[in-house]
Amino acid sequence: MSNFGASDLEAVLEVADVPPVINQIQFSPFEFRRTLLQACERRGVALEAYSPLGTGRHLRDRQVARIAERLGRTPAQVLIRWSLQRDVVVLPKSTHRERIEQNAHVFDFALTHEDMAALDGLDRTGGTDHALERPWW
C-alpha cells in the first residue's frame, strides 16, 4: 500500500483476503505520523518511510545538524537512524555514490533517548495522518 492513513488501513484489513504487509508513506521527524505508526504496529503492517530526508530540506535543520555534529555523523544519517530506531523501513533517495555509501553506514551507532525526543519535537503533523485521509473514496 502507499499513502494509506490509519482509517484506510483498517478498512482494507476488514475486507482483504490477503492483508497488506507494508504501507509506504512520507515519514520523518518532520512528518512523524504517530497514530499511523501505532496502527501499523498493532496490525503487523510494516511502515516504509518514503523521502525520509525531505528532498534535502530537513538536512539543513539546526536541531538535526547539532545532533549530527555531536555524533560525528551526517544529518542524513541521523534522520535515517531515527526511522530505523522506530522499526520503520527507510528508502532514502540519492544519485550520488558518496551519499548512498554514507546513508548505508547507520548501523554502528544509536541515537540517545534525548536525541529521539528532540527529533520527535520537529513533527509538523501533530502526530496525525490527516493529510493521508481520502474523503473522496
Briefly describe each language-model feature range.
Residues 1-137:
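Beta/alpha (TIM)-barrel catalytic core signal, keyed to glycine-rich beta->alpha loops juxtaposed to Asp/Glu
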